[in-house]
Amino acid sequence: MESTEKLTDTNAILAYLYETFPLCFIAEGETKPLKIGLFQDLAERLADDSKVSKTQLRIALRRYTSSWRYLKCVKAGAQRIDLDGNACGELEQEHIDHAAATLKESQDKAKAKRVAQAKSANPAAKTAKKPVKKPVAKRPKQTQSSKPAKEPVVAENLTPAVLAELKPKQRVNVKLGKSPVAGVILDIKKEDVQVQLDSGLTIKVRAEHILL
């Protein structure tokens, strides 16, 4: 005997029902309400069919009858049908109301899910459109004619200068505050010595404030 492969996928079982009972299970377009107790008829018809089990049939039937397409067909004036497509009586109002409520609830859930997905995807889209700009480090403003700062001069090894020993372009140290500041002599007028400090600042000092 040839072994028949059992169907386990719900979509595959539905496709099998569409093919086996085309007047009852409608694959496309408007469906028709099914007879109450149709599952028992279905189980009996397929009792010798090894392709499907009762459990899988029940799952497939639930999928079919809970689809929006099926719930929309459960309306006033519609006739229930059996496995062969024969009419089995009109729907009761209770069943029509239940189908309408189930359809609305299912559609509301689907809408809420779409809204939630759109909200969660929106920040990512904005981030993708507007790349984050890296902060640009500002360069410190340089004073005109500024030069790299040199190590502070140790005053212990310096001695006060004599005016006669000084001359333009000579590197000297000027006593300003506690620490001497290095610079270059620009000009000498009488007792005033004009010095440009390494910081770029130009000052006039007396010879006694200059250290060598």
UniProtKB/Swiss-Prot annotation:
Residues 107-153 are annotated as: Disordered. SMART domains: ProQ. The keyword Chaperone applies. The keyword Cell membrane does not apply. Keywords: Chaperone, Cytoplasm, RNA-binding. It is found in: Cytoplasm. InterPro entries: ProQ, ProQ/FinO, ProQ/FinO_sf, ProQ_C. GO terms for biological process: post-transcriptional regulation of gene expression. Residues 117-126 have a biased composition (Low complexity). SUPFAM superfamilies: FinO-like. GO terms for cellular component: cytosol. One of its GO terms (molecular function) is RNA strand annealing activity. Residues 127-141 have a biased composition (Basic residues). Belongs to the ProQ family. RNA chaperone with significant RNA binding, RNA strand exchange and RNA duplexing activities. This is RNA chaperone ProQ. It comes from Shewanella halifaxensis (strain HAW-EB4).
